Structures are given as structure tokens and as C-alpha cells.
């Protein structure tokens, strides 16, 4: 069965399924959603000023629901290729546990709900950025870029980079140079992260015709690009210290983490072409996840430490 045939077969399924709550939760891409929630929370913490704790909780929940909605829409559209790729074949739609029409309705309802509640409860700037993020991921990336260009991850990575900017906007009702730097850290991190995955999943992407960079330009070009983006990410991650919204101590931590990130990318660059085990690529993929969590954790710890010092100084 071809990708097109499989897509048509899935589309004919108009009957209501007997999906469980767990199946619907899986549609939300919970692992991706956890990263979105974490970086959005970082934006809330790092932004100057304060937000009512209840409104902050509502903001995080809306961002989480919006991220889950875009994940559901992505799974709806990609059900045809998900059924072929070993990494995604057990997802609810290709596995037959949820009908495509149900997934589409689920994603659309959650999208509208998350944007409306965020706008009404917090502010419409953050809601507007959330709406654009959902649209960008579900339409621009999923329906257009992913299957048409090897730069899909580079451009499409913007969708995953918006959450800290949304969190920041929830507090300040503005987009600033600081929130743009938080955006850029994730935006520049994304290619190295996903191309490491694409290297050891080349056959899967080739089977479904998704033009990932390793399949289109080869392993050597991909490895060079991975190193370049790792270097850019490491530099950008130090900028909060340079711009003054993080301390020198944070800058040292970010520099050390960046050095390890670059080292792992160089290990991938030195990996022989055609290496079937792809161990350096797998290590880079795993470390890149830790790296992003560590950078944003360090930023939040640094911010909280500064607040405690300021509070202690003011109470003397």
C-alpha cells in the first residue's frame, strides 16, 4: 500500500471509534507538550514583573492545550506516513484506535478553546502568538514544509520556539529582545536535535518520501550543518548573560553546556558515512534534550536566585 492509498483508506474511516482517554492523551504528543510547558513556564518566570498565580496557571494550561491541539492536528494529517514509519506506526490513528475525523475535531476544538481562554483570561497578544504557533505547526510545517523541502525542520522549528515568548507575553503583554533571545535558543537548537534523529532514521523518512536533509543532501552535508547549528545555539544560549537578564554565573554554565553540545556534534561530524549503528548521532539526540532542559533550568534558577538576593537585601 502506498502513502496515498493509505491516506485514502484512513480518510474513509468515518465511524466513531472506541478510543480510550489514553488514546486521546497520546494524540496530544505528551512528550513534546512537556517541553512546551517547561519552556513556556520559563518565559513566565524570566519575564520582568509579576502575574497573578491563578492567571499564570491558566496561561500554562492554555499553552499546554494549544500545544496538544497542534500535535493532534499533526497526527491527523500525517496519519498516512505515520502508518509506514516504525517510530510512529503505533500512534492512535494509524493503529486504528481513533478515526481521523475524530482527531481533526479534537484538535480544532482544543485549538479554539486554548486561544479563546488565554485571550479572555490573560491578554490577547499572548493568545495571538499561541494561535499563530498552532497555525504555523499544523499548516505551514505539517501540511507544506515537512513534505516539500529539506529545510522543513529549520523553518518549521519556529513553532517549537514560540512557547517561552508566549509565557513572557503573558506577563508583560509585549515582545522584547529578551523573549526573542529565548525564542532563538530553541529555534537554533532544533536543527541539530532533529537532524541527529534523521540520521539514524533515514530509512523511515526515505520510505515515506519526507525530504529530510540526510536523504536529500547526504550524511556529510547534514553533519556539517549539525555542527554549525550547535555552535550557533551555544553562542545564543550565552546571550542572556551578555544582555543582562541573567548573571555571569549563568553564562559560565551555559558556556560549559554549549561546549559539550558542540563536542557531541563534532563526534557526529567525525562519524564515518554509512555507519549503521549511528551511536554518536543517538548520543547527540539524547544530550540535546538534556541540554535544552538544562539551559532553561539554569535560567530559571538564576532568576529565582536574583529575586531572593534582592528580597534579602530589601529586608535588611
UniProtKB/Swiss-Prot annotation:
GO molecular function: protoheme IX farnesyltransferase activity
Gene Ontology CC annotation, any one: plasma membrane
UniProt keyword annotations, A-Z: Cell inner membrane, Cell membrane, Heme biosynthesis, Membrane, Transferase, Transmembrane, Transmembrane helix
One Pfam family from the record: UbiA
Subcellular location: Cell inner membrane
Domain of life: Bacteria
PROSITE patterns: UBIA (PS00943)
GO biological process: heme O biosynthetic process
Transmembrane segments: 32-52, 53-73, 93-113, 116-136, 152-172, 180-200, 226-246, 248-268, 289-309
Catalytic activities: heme b + (2E,6E)-farnesyl diphosphate + H2O = Fe(II)-heme o + diphosphate
Pathway recorded for this protein: Porphyrin-containing compound metabolism; heme O biosynthesis; heme O from protoheme: step 1/1
Bilayer topology annotation: Multi-pass membrane protein
EC numbers, comma separated: 2.5.1.141
Disulphide connectivity of cysteines: none
Family in the record: Belongs to the UbiA prenyltransferase family. Protoheme IX farnesyltransferase subfamily.
Record's miscellaneous remark: Carbon 2 of the heme B porphyrin ring is defined according to the Fischer nomenclature.
Role of this protein: Converts heme B (protoheme IX) to heme O by substitution of the vinyl group on carbon 2 of heme B porphyrin ring with a hydroxyethyl farnesyl side group.
Name of the protein: Protoheme IX farnesyltransferase
Gene: ctaB
Amino acid at each position: 500500500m502506498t502513502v496515498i492509498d493509505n491516506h485514502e483508506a484512513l480518510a474513509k474511516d468515518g465511524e466513531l471509534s472506541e478510543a480510550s482517554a489514553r488514546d486521546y492523551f497520546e494524540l496530544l504528543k505528551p512528550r513534546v507538550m512537556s517541553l512546551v510547558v517547561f519552556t513556556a513556564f520559563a518565559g513566565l518566570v524570566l519575564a520582568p514583573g509579576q502575574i497573578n498565580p491563578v492567571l499564570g496557571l491558566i496561561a500554562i494550561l492554555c499553552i499546554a492545550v494549544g500545544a496538544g491541539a497542534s500535535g493532534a492536528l499533526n497526527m491527523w494529517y500525517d496519519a498516512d506516513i505515520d502508518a509506514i514509519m516504525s517510530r510512529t506506526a503505533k500512534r492512535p490513528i494509524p493503529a486504528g484506535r481513533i478515526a481521523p475525523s475524530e482527531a481533526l475535531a479534537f484538535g480544532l476544538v482544543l485549538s479554539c478553546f486554548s486561544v479563546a481562554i488565554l485571550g479572555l483570561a490573560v491578554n490577547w497578544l499572548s493568545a495571538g502568538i499561541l494561535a499563530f504557533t498552532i497555525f504555523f505547526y499544523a499548516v505551514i510545517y505539517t501540511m507544506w514544509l515537512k513534505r516539500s523541502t529539506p529545510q522543513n525542520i529549520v523553518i518549521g522549528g519556529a513553532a517549537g520556539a514560540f512557547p517561552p515568548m508566549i509565557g513572557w507575553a503573558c506577563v508583560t503583554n509585549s515582545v522584547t529582545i529578551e523573549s526573542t533571545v529565548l525564542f532563538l535558543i530553541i529555534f537554533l537548537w532544533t536543527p541539530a536535535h532533529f537532524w541527529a534523529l534523521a540520521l539514524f532514521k533515514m530509512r523511515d523518512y526515505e520510505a515515506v518520501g519526507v525530504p529530510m536533509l540526510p536523504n536529500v543532501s547526504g550524511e556529510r552535508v547534514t553533519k556539517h550543518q549539525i555542527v554549525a547549528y550547535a555552535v550557533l545555539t551555544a553562542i545564543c544560549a550565552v546571550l542572556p548573560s551578555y544582555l543582562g537578564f541573567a548573571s555571569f554565573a549563568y553564562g559560565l554554565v551555559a558556556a560549559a553546556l554549549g561546549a559539550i553540545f558542540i563536542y557531541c556534534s563534532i563526534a557526529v561530524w567525525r562519524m564515518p558515512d554509512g555507519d549503521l549503528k549511528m551511536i554518536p548521532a543517538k548520543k547527540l539526540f539524547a544530550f540535546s534534550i538534556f541540554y535544552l532542559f538544562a539551559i532553561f533550568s539554569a535560567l530559571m534558577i538564576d532568576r529565582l536566585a536574583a529575586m531572593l538576593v534582592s528580597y534579602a537585601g530589601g529586608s535588611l
